[in-house]
Amino acid sequence: MASGILLNVKEEVTCPICLELLTEPLSLPCGHSFCQACITANHKKSMLYKEEERSCPVCRISYQPENIQPNRHVANIVEKLREVKLSPEEGQKVDHCARHGEKLLLFCQEDRKVICWLCERSQEHRGHHTFLMEEVAQEYHVKLQTALEMLRQKQQEAEKLEADIREEKASWKIQIDYDKTNVLADFEQLREILDWEESNELQYLEKEEEDILKSLTKSETKMVRQTQYVRELISDLEHRLQGSMMELLQGVDGIIKRIENMTLKKPETFHKNQRRVFRAPALKGMLDMFRELTDVRRYWVDVTLAPNNISHVVIAEDKRQVSSRNPQIMYWAQGKLFQSLKNFNYCTGILGSQSITSGKHYWEVDVSKKSAWILGVCAGFQPDAMYDVEQNENYQPKYGYWVIGLQEGVKYSVFQDGSSHTPFAPFIAPLSVIFCPDRVGVFVDYEACTVSFFNITNHGFLIYKFSQCSFSKPVFPYLNPRKCTVPMTLCSPSS
């Protein structure tokens, strides 16, 4: 009953020209309504044939263009009609056109849709190739059967990928748990001195576990969705193939496009051989370094700085801190006094007041926040003579310098003897320093002829060691703040 009324209403609001529901309906004085685009096209046609009067395409009653009025009432009916969704009991049958109510007997090859005879004559399908459903059903049955077999194969591949990612996830979990266990066991042996390293290593592994398992879980979720999607397509195809001819062809374009556009995506995985693996021997080496540092600290001496006559070097009152300042050079030109702010390459090396002629001696220098410095020991000069060390500086062991340095904030170097081709210039070799030191320890063993440098910031790791040093003269602690104005500080034994 309701469907019959609905069809009658649809007839009343269907454009007589395009046979579709009215779009932006306009009403003529005679009462007939048309789509705005359709009646406008009718006007142009009348002008083309030079007709003196414009007439209604239905009843042929003449009208003037200015008498055409928008029909809001009809527009509202059309809008409501488009929103109507009938229940299965009251709605149209599945084999009837939802738009025209006519029986679906034809198949449009271009749109791959089942249509009625009115659809075939509409603007949407005009010029398309249409066939009776019986003529194309077998062809599409073969296509869908082939697609079903292909999807079943893809289902197997998808399930294998899903299983692989789950196995990969479990493998990563076991591997990382194993590494965590090793870390805990190794750090337990070194608990007193390696608490920081233990915490740092565990944090790294926790972050690695979180990142990798999170990524693998996302991949697993994608694989599950992918598998489910394939299953849904298979279920849809099986339903179509087992149903009626109408069910086979109804919406077949959509299902074919989904199948054609579907490609299986492989999950993101990680290579175990590319990750950083924790090794306990490194901790044992760290323990050896720490024990060596503990041993040399027994020889800590209270070093202070000697007075100097270098104008651009500032020594603190406690004689533990030294810093450099940029020189300001005054000069006359054209009868006027000018100030130059140019940074000349002045030397800024300072000696410690304590001379070393025997035994073992150790001290530490705070170099935090500095971008450049040089430190170590220097031989052959008497600091109490107010001698400007820098006038004859040549950082080579053969000239009495056993030093290391930093430049540009990241480049650590050791100054060695120059080659035979450049004997008067030191060979500056780069040092591999993983953790930048805020404090450097210096140890001199006069009898063993060695000078060692320790990274106190990194648990006393050895930075560099000079061996077979020629200590034919007294040696002194040496500090050079270079052009960086941040001070260098000699640490007291109690610090």
Swiss-Prot record:
Zn(2+) binds at C97, H100, C119, H125. Keywords: Acetylation, Antiviral defense, Autophagy, Coiled coil, Cytoplasm, Immunity, Innate immunity, Metal-binding, Nucleus, Phosphoprotein, Transferase, Ubl conjugation, Ubl conjugation pathway, Zinc, Zinc-finger. It holds the Pfam family zf-RING_UBOX. One of its GO terms (cellular component) is P-body. The modification N-acetylalanine is found at A2. One of its GO terms (molecular function) is pattern recognition receptor activity. Capsid-specific restriction factor that prevents infection from non-host-adapted retroviruses. Blocks viral replication early in the life cycle, after viral entry but before reverse transcription. In addition to acting as a capsid-specific restriction factor, also acts as a pattern recognition receptor that activates innate immune signaling in response to the retroviral capsid lattice. This is Tripartite motif-containing protein 5. It comes from Erythrocebus patas.
